[in-house]
UniProtKB/Swiss-Prot annotation:
The Lon proteolytic domain, residue ranges: 891-1077
Protein name listed in UniProt: Lon protease homolog, mitochondrial
Organism field: Emericella nidulans (strain FGSC A4 / ATCC 38163 / CBS 112.46 / NRRL 194 / M139)
SMART domains noted in UniProt: AAA (SM00382), LON (SM00464)
Highest taxon of source: Eukaryota
GO cellular component: mitochondrial matrix
Length: 1104
């Protein structure tokens, strides 16, 4: 530092430190943050100019002369003992000393912690010595400059500060002789150096710093924190702040210039406080002065290498601040100006920087004036929305713009970016922009975004406040209403009425004693609960369910046999077994006077009426009907309910059925019981065991109700397609009633009596002369709908009538019934009302007319319209036939037989084909290949049949060595359909024998039966369905096991009509029926010619 500036700094140091530090940056008084920094800046600027300079160190200053000033040191030594004696004399000799002394006293009066009078006198004495040595210092500096032009000045300062002369208690230099001249600048704020070539770089995260705006940062690196503290002690608290490119980066040292933006700010550390809870970190308050740019980086590793060569002279901890004369002397001795050389002993990042200068601009430019005005307007808008922003604008305007805003557009752009929450790169662009015309629009963009955020925040705040106010108003009104009711004596929160309602319901029900006890307990609990309590609603829902179960409520049953018969015949054709069982059930109830619940299970293929028969039974018995399906059900809670501890718990489907039916004796249909699933929530089929057990369901326990419910009076009807997938314990609890498929005669009767009339009414042809002839229905059944049920037949009949309706409307034309005549009186009134509201519609599209919701009348078809749909014209309505022949083969070749199968879809004809793969030769090897998607049981039946027929051939046809040399292939058509079951044994054996004996079979013979290896024919199931399938396939003879004779006798005559049945116990009986005309001698020699050929002598044995 120049010697000429020493007096000014010494005078500044005479200002009491506590007067400045305590109100501005006291650690206990303020938290460092945006608002505290603004407040600090405002209070700092409100101080007199003489009090704005302060030291950054709180330690006492060590009294010692500047290095190299031997005269001062000797004077100090000579006058060490005479300080007190000479003070008064010095004051008398120079009246200006009194002025300095009075200023010192003034400082002491302001700050109680000011130095004692002895210390003040010593400080005045040092100032006097400085005055006397000013001339000598100036001469010494001039001589040094003259001797070596390469030696730089100590510390360069700004032009204004170098031009201003130092002032203090005495005038130094040439002003010493000007007595009586008043100096208005007794104390001045030290100026910021205009040139500072090397600074310590501190990386900043999230957002850059802008000149003129304080920023508090946290330093956790101990080396950086220590370096900052030493910089402040040396009176050189200047750093460079540069923004991280990665917004997630963190650190206090710059490792590479690629990590930060090269444009930053030259900032002064105005204060540093230790971090709370951390020993090494500090919180530093930075005040940026100007923009700078990195020219080169000295990484931490490089800066510490030269740390040993720097001057080790440092100030002790007890000093107030290091003497500026000492620093100046240290720097003068060096060859180059390096104010940060003492930082090289720390592993911090140092950068060489250069100042950035703003490009000249015209303040009167229209663009600058327009953008400046817009920024001011946006600031005003934000200030109206955000009070904190309004305070920031007020402080900024007071500090930065003593005059007109348009005179400082650069500062205005910086302010816009500093207070906005824009993106990192947007703010950095504002900082890097040195062209004012470019910087202003960029600042305006980020400020506009801040305005949008403020508007959105205000909108959200208003919406939330409105909702809260609405709730508060409702709550206040409710409380006021309660108070009014309390004053009128009609106070009631609804709980008393609710309790009374439950009591009234319970009085109408015949609750069992155990249920009544639980009801009273829960009702008492409800009476003592607050309506706002969460358990209040749980108890209320439970009592609601408890009082909605029809305890003791029964529907009056109809035990009339004739009435039940009429109802069942009206709804269904056939189904004699089901109807007889229901009539038996009614007869028993009529004799006993009461009916106990039963569990029936209707088993049959789809479309035979299992579900609809349940509704007919309920109507015949005059019982309420409830149906639910358990197909795919995996949760036990659907049957037995959830426990009340769960949120949203409900009872099971059985309790829900009782609530809906409001009787204890409804008919509950459990559909698709064979398709019930199993999951991690449990096994619902096991839950049905208690429900469907007549010995246990008298005290069925639902998890939600937790009280026994009597289900013994409920008639349960289950439906299933097959019984194989029903668990055996569950199947044992149900009474099975099998519904076989319908034969052609039954389908014809059902179509004529039920399906056709319903389809005519559904398609609007009830009063139209449209006839579907009997031949057409027979053709539909024969060529389109061969399944066991009538569901597909119903679809085809509806399709025929729909086509007929379209044909009639097309032939009559659109003018038969105009749109204005198609509306009913109600529809016309609605249309007129709509026209009054919306006005007359000049043009209405056809689509709008077609989609009107106004009621319409039916079209009256003239009596002249007649339409008859016969067999010949059926293809015009339903397309070509699906099944063209009655059977797969009109004539069977050897090896083909027709068996019978029973599936979930009903009975079906199962053909078995066997062929010889290779020609028979003495060298050929036997074998059997099987195809047709056969499952394990059928594969075993194939092996049994193969072994059995080889035994038959060996015994009855020993000369026929067919199976010893034949490579065979057996196949069952429709390979996409999985096939399984043991009833195809005799069919496979017959197919192999027919091929071995080369004897074709009669195509009208069908067979079914399980075969053992000894030839025994065992019992099979589904004889009715298989008989129906045989009739559809055109069979006239059926071979079945003798054990199924009872099933055959129970078949209706219409099913057995035209079919001859043969019951067999051994396969020999089957052989006699099928091969009655067989010539055994010829059959013995049928393959003799092929097997007697001598083997070829050539090596080509494969040539046939």
């Amino acid at each position: 530092m120049l010697r000429g500036q020493t007096l000014r700094w010494r005078a500044a140091l005479q200002t009491p430190r506590s007067l400045i530090l305590r109100p501005l940056f006291a650690p206990g008084g303020y938290n460092v943050g945006p608002r505290s920094v603004l407040e600090t800046s405002r209070r700092f600027r409100s101080l007199p100019p003489s009090l704005r300079t302060f030291s950054s160190s709180t330690a006492r200053r060590k009294e010692k002369p500047p290095p190299g000033d031997e005269k001062e040191d000797s004077n100090k030594k000579e006058n060490k003992d005479n300080d007190d004696g000479t003070e008064d004399k010095e004051v008398e000799r120079d009246p200006r000393r009194k002025q300095a002394d009075s200023s010192g006293k003034h400082g002491s009066s302001v700050d109680p912690g000011a130095p004692t009078s002895g210390f003040a006198r010593r400080r005045e004495k040092a100032a006097d010595r400085d005055q006397r040595s000013v001339t000598e210092d100036a001469k010494r500096e001039a001589e040094a400059k003259g001797n070596s032009s390469d030696t730089p000045s100590a510390i360069p300062v700004s032009d204004s500060s170098s031009e201003s002369k130092p002032s203090g208690s005495h005038n130094g230099g040439d002003d010493g002789g000007k007595k009586g001249k008043k100096n208005d600048k007794a104390l001045q704020k030290p100026s910021v150096p205009d040139v500072y070539p090397q600074v310590m770089a501190i990386p900043i995260a999230k957002r850059p710093l802008f000149p003129g705006f304080y920023k508090a940062i946290t330093i956790r690196d101990p080396n950086v924190a220590t370096a900052i503290q030493e910089m402040m002690k040396r009176g050189q608290p200047y750093v460079g702040a540069f923004l991280f490119k990665d917004e997630n980066a963190d650190g206090d040292v710059i490792e590479s210039t690629d990590d930060v933006y090269d444009t930053g700010v030259f900032a002064q550390v105005t204060a540093a406080y230790p971090l709370r809870g951390e020993q090494s970190g500090v919180t530093a308050v930075l005040y940026p002065h100007r923009r700078i740019k990195i020219s080169s980086l000295i990484p931490p590793g490089d800066s510490t290498k030269s740390g040993n060569s720097e001057d080790k002279t440092t100030e002790k901890r007890g000093d107030v601040v290091a003497s500026f004369e000492e620093n100046a002397a240290e720097l003068v001795t060096k060859d180059h100006y390096e104010p940060t050389s003492f930082l090289r002993k720390y592993p911090v990042s140092l950068v060489n920087v250069e100042n950035l200068t703003e490009e000249p601009f015209d303040k009167k430019s229209a663009i600058i004036r327009a953008v400046t005005s817009e920024i001011v307007n946006v600031c005003k808008e934000i200030a109206t929305l955000n009070p904190l922003f309004r305070d920031q604008i007020s402080a900024f305007y007071t500090d930065q713009f003593p005059g007109n805003l348009s005179d400082e557009p650069a500062k205005l752009a910086d302010f816009a970016a500093a207070v906005s929450g824009g993106e990192l790169h947007e703010l950095q662009e504002v900082l890097e922009s040195m062209n004012i015309e470019e910087r202003l629009p960029k600042g305006l963009v980020v400020l506009k975004k801040e305005l949008m955020n403020a508007q959105l925040q205000t909108k959200i705040s208003k919406d939330v406040e409105a909702k809260i106010q609405k709730r508060q108003r409702e709550y206040w009104l409710m409380e006021q209403m309660k108070g009014i009711k309390r004053e009128l004596g009609i106070e009631s929160d609804g709980k008393d009425k609710l309790v009374e309602k439950f009591k009234e319901k319970a009085e109408k029900l015949a609750m069992p004693e155990a249920v009544k006890k639980v009801f009273d307990e829960e009702l008492n609990k409800l009476a003592h609960l607050e309506p706002a309590a969460s358990e209040f609603n749980v108890t209320r829902n439970y009592l609601d369910w408890l009082t909605q179960i029809p305890w003791g409520q029964k529907s009056v049953e109809n035990f009339g046999i004739s009435h039940a018969t009429d109802v069942l015949n009206e709804d269904h054709y056939g189904l004699k077994d089901v109807k007889d069982r229901i009539l038996e059930f009614i007869a028993v109830g009529k004799l006993r006077g009461t009916v106990e619940g039963k569990i029936l299970c209707l088993v049959g293929p789809p479309g035979v009426g299992k579900t609809s028969i349940g509704k007919s039974i309920a109507r015949a018995l005059n019982r309420q009907y409830y149906r639910f399906s358990v197909g795919g059900l995996t949760d036990v809670a659907e049957i037995k309910g959830h426990r009340r501890t769960y949120v949203g718990a409900l009872p099971g489907r059985i309790i829900q059925a009782l609530k809906k039916c409001q009787t204890e004796n409804p008919l509950i249909l459990i559909d698709e019981v064979d398709k019930i699933g199993r999951g991690h929530q449990g096994d619902p089929s096991s839950a049905l065991l208690e429900l469907l057990d007549p010995e246990q369901n008298s005290s069925f326990l639902d998890h939600y109700m937790d009280v026994p419910v009597d289900l013994s009076k409920v008639l349960f009807v289950c439906t299933a397609n097959v019984t194989d997938t029903i668990p055996r314990p569950l199947l044992d609890r149900m009474e099975l009633i099998e519904l076989s498929g319908y034969v052609a005669d039954e389908k014809m009767a059902i179509a004529q009596k039920y399906l056709a009339p319903a389809a005519r009414e559904l398609t609007g042809l009830k009063n139209v002369d449209v006839t579907l002839t009997e031949e057409a229905i027979e053709e539909l059944i024969k060529s389109y709908c061969r399944e066991s049920g009538v569901r597909n037949l119903k679809k085809q009949i509806e399709k025929v009538y729909r086509k007929a309706a379209f044909k009639i409307v097309s032939d009559l034309g659109e003018d038969v019934l105009a749109e204005d005549k198609a509306l009913t009186a109600e529809g016309k009134a609605a249309q007129e009302e709509s026209e009054k509201e919306t006005g007359p519609i000049e043009s209405t599209s056809e689509q709008e007319k077609a989609t009107t919701e106004n009621p319409r009348v039916a079209l009256n078809v003239p009596d002249s319209v007649h339409l008859s749909i016969g067999k010949d014209s059926l293809t015009d309505y339903v397309g070509p036939p699906i099944f063209t022949t009655d059977r797969l083969y009109d004539t069977f070749p050897p090896g083909v037989t027709m068996g019978l199968a029973w599936t979930s879809m009903g009975g079906a004809a199962l053909y078995v084909e066997s062929i010889l793969e290779n020609a028979l030769t003495p060298e050929s090897q036997p074998g059997l290949d099987i195809t047709g998607n056969l499952q394990n049981v059928m594969k075993e039946s194939t092996q049994i049949a193969y072994s059995f027929v080889k035994s038959v051939m060996a015994k009855q046809f020993p000369e026929n060595r067919f199976f010893e040399k034949a490579k065979l292939h057996m196949h069952c058509p429709e390979g996409a359909v999985p096939k399984d079951g043991p009833s195809a044994g005799i069919t496979m054996a017959t197919s192999l024998l027919s091929l071995a004996l080369n004897h074709p079979l009669d195509p009208t013979i069908a067979m079914t039966g399980e075969l053992t290896v000894t030839g025994k024919v065992l019992r099979i199931g589904g004889l009715r369905e298989k008989t129906v399938a045989a009739r559809r396939a055109g069979a006239k003879t059926i071979i079945f096991p003798a054990d199924n004779m009872s099933d055959w006798l129970e078949l209706p005559e219409n099913i057995k009509s035209g079919i001859e049945g043969h019951a067999v116990s051994w396969y020999s009986e089957v052989f006699d029926i099928l091969f009655a005309d067989l010539d055994k001698q010829a059959a013995n020699r049928v393959w003799q010619k092929q097997l007697s050929k001598e083997p070829k002598k050539s090596n080509d044995k494969d040539d046939h």
